[in-house]
Regions:
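Bacterial N-terminal signal peptides
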Residues: 10-21
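Extracellular/lumen-exposed scaffold segments
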Residues: 26-148
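N-terminal secretory signal peptides that target proteins for export/translocation
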Residues: 1-5
Length: 148
């Protein structure tokens, strides 16, 4: 027969798992992150993007702080390691779009890991969000023939 401590730990674990599953499902109902996975060439300045799109009656808070922290793989040089609201290339109540400028210094499959911080709101409530996302980059050597 399980002890009270074992039962308590199992119950707490189940509640936490349920909360996390609900939070993840809830986030998908509030917003969508649209990634701009791209192809790049070594040495060429390239841009990719991350768009925060509101869903289900929610909107992107146009006054709250917003940022995108960038951590690129080796072989990727970014122009700015942290983008803020001032760096948005498009902003409406329904979406916010960051353009991420970078230069690849070596070929291969690369990633720019990002942490987006923003606030989503409805008429009576707001929800601060921190979301991690990876932008995929396929880098080809300079002068390599382009794939069709």
């Amino acid at each position: 027969m399980p002890s009270a401590k074992t039962t308590l730990i199992a119950t707490a674990g189940a509640l936490l798992a349920g909360f996390l599953a609900t939070s993840a499902a809830h986030a998908e109902d509030i917003y969508e992150l649209k990634k701009g996975d791209v192809k790049a060439t070594v040495g060429a300045k390239t841009t990719t993007s991350l768009t925060i799109a509101a869903r289900s009656g929610w909107h992107v808070n146009e006054e709250a702080p917003m940022s995108l922290k960038l951590l690129p793989d080796p072989g990727i040089t970014i122009d700015k390691p942290r983008l803020t609201r001032a760096d948005l290339t498009q902003q409406t109540k329904d979406l916010a779009r960051f353009e991420v400028a970078f230069t690849a210094t070596e070929p291969g499959k690369k990633t720019i890991n990002c942490e987006a911080s923003f606030v989503m709101c409805q008429a009576s409530t707001c929800k601060p969000v921190k979301e991690k996302v990876a932008l995929a980059i396929d880098v080809t050597p300079a002068g390599a023939p382009k794939k069709k």
